[in-house]
Amino acid sequence: ALVCTLSVFNGFQDMVASFFTAFDPQLKITVREGKVFDGQDKRIGVVCLLPEVDVFTETLEENAMVQYKDRQAMVVLKGVEDNFEELTAIDSILYGAGDFLLHDSIVNYGVMGGELVATLGTGLQFVDPLQVYLPKRNAKVNMANPGASFNRDYLYSPGVVFVVNQQEYDGKYILTSLDFLRQLLDYTTEVSAIELKLLSLIHISE
């Protein structure tokens, strides 16, 4: 079963806004059980094509380990589509001389939270790539060669970081390309959520 979460409720906007940030969508469709579902599900298409929907995007989240030089951290990778800027006010929380960029024709980029940047010691514009490790799905750990049990890839800096002043995000999250994360997880159309922005906020009758 799919669940739709409303981030901003009419009549409670100020209170709810204190718990949500420029990082969060107005609406999020997730699965009731499990971690992922098929983003191409026909029911999803029906919702996304409603006239009230302005922007929708597929997102995928997974825990990972990252390493920069001799420092490591456990993080949450959030893979998003290129229209994520249209869905949220992400531009309002970016710092640095670069641009919000998820990938180009050569490499993939990671936009990190400010606290995570400090933890890893990367600085705003790191030159060396950030190593990303994810356990291979449905694979047993090879004790003789533990590294063979992980998929590894690299992320580069687009020259910006985000700061929302919430440790949950600033200290853990890395925004990157949806395709990059799907490839690391051996996924095709799987998503963690469908995030939506409405043309105007829904008014809930009392």
PLM region spans:
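A generic structural signal for short hydrophobic patches within well-formed alpha-helices
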Residues: 85, 116-117, 181
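Extracytoplasmic
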Residues: 22-24, 70-75, 107, 125-127, ...
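A generic local secondary-structure boundary/capping motif
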Residues: 17, 65-67, 98-100, 119-123, ...
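Short, solvent-exposed hinge/capping segments at secondary-structure junctions
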Residues: 112-127
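Soluble periplasmic/extracytoplasmic beta-strand elements of cell-envelope proteins
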Residues: 28-30, 57, 74-79, 110-113, ...
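Hydrophobic, regular-secondary-structure patches
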Residues: 7-76, 82-89, 93-106
